[in-house]
């Protein structure tokens, strides 16, 4: 028998729309999920891996279940029920995720377990239901085996196209405009509306519309009033971060401190509310060493803005002819610094909103490059993780070209001097020593060798020129900072590689630090 394959099977528009928008909602759910987990467990590679892995596994289970059920009962009413249940589950996720994440955080599991259980409990149910949609739609659209390939192909393409739209809408638009809970409520509303397309009975359509209106109204109310049980303080979402601004008291002196938090395990920036230009964090004071090693320092590059504590301090304490270029990835953080951390416009301050490595790459190939007197680096993707692309031999080459021969590169690293928590520091030290002839180490928190295995801020000062690493008569202003210098011979661990663009296992070494702590 010869089949006529010239006839193109017409797929009902309602099924095409269901396939398209269910794919978009799935990707929005995944992107928004990362923002909901971030305040509790960070945004490290481990968290992303767990989230993507669990959602993909759930979709796989949903595809299998949906196909099996559709073969036994290819009924549009059943697909409508699946969509309604998915909408309700997504709405429940929006309202109760903070309760669940807070409870999981209280169990003090390691990051692997916390990330997996968070994704499993919060996102697996809705992902399984959404995964059931595609095979169910394909079965409803399929009338005979002759056209099965074309039907499945077109519906798969529509689902993928929806996923693409959801990815760009979620990443470029929604997350920067709305809180995570609002996005999930809107997603739930869309899924509820899809059920209207597949239901045939009038009363079922009315029920679906009622659920849609309830969820849509919930999204609006959520935007106005916020979700219950959010972490304390002001909560903000940007394109790159979930930010918390809280206030506390510095136990050392009883003064009020405003704190910017981008990771649950560490603070990003601190500011005294009664004197914003004064530095709070001990490690930030070590950037002053640039003026010790090069007293005529005027032009400074800072990679990583955060709360702009260091630029604010330098603009207040240095002469009028100083100039500071700050490279900060997240424009939202800069706006928070303006709104909450006393960052003012200043003709001596220039801000670049881009990835620090792309800035270095562009400057590296600029024939009219104007070198800097000092470069400060304070960049983190989570509590202790420096972006790997800023820790490598290739990065050091670019930094060296941007820095004057007698200028100082000052890098903040969170690690230990020796032991299992030292991997990040040793890898960066090896990578940077290829380009800088002078490398000086300043344990900012505990300089005594007995604390060599303690996790702390380690300040690495690198210079292109060979200079005396010990100043015989330091200015009194710098004496305390210089007393932290590590003067014992330092030998990097031979088991730790010099980080390169091709291989920089920063996440693995940082995870060891967290697990040991």
Q: What residue ranges belong to the model's regions?
A:
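Conserved SAM-binding loop and adjacent beta-strand
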Residues: 272-284
């Amino acid at each position: 028998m010869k089949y006529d394959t010239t006839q193109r099977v017409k797929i009902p528009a309602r099924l095409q729309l269901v396939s398209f928008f269910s794919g978009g909602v799935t990707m929005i759910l995944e992107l928004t999920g990362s923002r909901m987990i971030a305040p509790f467990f960070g945004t490290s590679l481990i968290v992303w891996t767990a989230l993507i892995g669990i959602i993909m596994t759930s979709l796989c289970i949903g595809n299998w279940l949906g196909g099996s059920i559709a073969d036994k009962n290819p009924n549009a009413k059943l697909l409508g029920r699946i969509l309604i249940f998915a909408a309700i589950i997504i709405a429940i996720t929006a309202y109760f995720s903070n309760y669940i994440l807070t409870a999981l955080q209280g169990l003090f599991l390691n990051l692997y377990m916390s990330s997996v259980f968070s994704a499993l409990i919060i996102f697996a149910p809705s992902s399984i239901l959404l995964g059931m949609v595609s095979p169910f739609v394909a079965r409803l659209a399929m009338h005979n085996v002759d056209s099965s390939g074309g039907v499945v192909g077109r519906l798969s393409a529509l689902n993928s196209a929806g996923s693409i739209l959801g990815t760009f809408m979620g990443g470029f638009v929604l997350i920067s405009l709305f809180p995570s809970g609002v996005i999930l409520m809107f997603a739930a509303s869309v899924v509820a509306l899809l059920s209207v397309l597949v239901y045939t009975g009038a009363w079922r359509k009315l029920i679906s519309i009622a659920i849609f209106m309830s969820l849509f109204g919930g999204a609006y109310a959520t935007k106005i009033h916020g979700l219950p049980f959010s972490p304390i303080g002001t909560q903000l979402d940007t394109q790159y971060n979930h930010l918390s601004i809280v206030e506390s008291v510095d136990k050392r002196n009883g003064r009020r401190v405003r704190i910017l938090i981008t990771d649950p395990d560490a603070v990003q920036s601190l500011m005294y509310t009664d004197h914003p230009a004064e530095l709070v964090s001990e490690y930030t004071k070590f950037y002053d060493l640039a003026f010790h090693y090069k007293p005529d320092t005027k032009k400074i590059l800072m990679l990583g803005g955060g709360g702009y504590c260091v630029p604010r301090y330098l603009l207040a304490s240095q002469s009028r002819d100083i100039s500071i270029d700050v490279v900060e990835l997240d424009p939202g953080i800069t706006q928070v610094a303006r709104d909450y951390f006393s960052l003012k416009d200043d003709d001596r301050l220039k801000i670049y909103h881009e990835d620090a490595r792309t800035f270095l790459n562009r400057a590296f190939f600029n024939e009219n490059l104007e070198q800097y007197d000092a470069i400060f680096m304070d960049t983190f993707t989570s509590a202790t993780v420096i972006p790997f692309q800023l820790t490598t031999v290739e990065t050091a080459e670019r930094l060296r070209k941007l820095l004057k021969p007698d200028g100082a590169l000052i890098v903040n690293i969170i690690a230990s001097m020796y032991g299992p928590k030292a991997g990040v520091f040793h890898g960066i030290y090896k990578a940077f020593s290829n380009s800088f002839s002078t490398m000086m180490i300043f344990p900012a928190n505990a300089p005594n060798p007995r604390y060599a295995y303690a996790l702390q801020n380690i300040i690495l000062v690198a210079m292109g020129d060979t200079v005396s690493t010990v100043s015989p008569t330091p200015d009194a202003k710098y004496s305390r900072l210089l007393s932290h210098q590590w003067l014992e011979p330092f030998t990097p661990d031979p088991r730790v590689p010099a980080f390169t663009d091709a291989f920089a296992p920063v996440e693995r070494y940082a995870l060891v630090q967290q697990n040991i702590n």
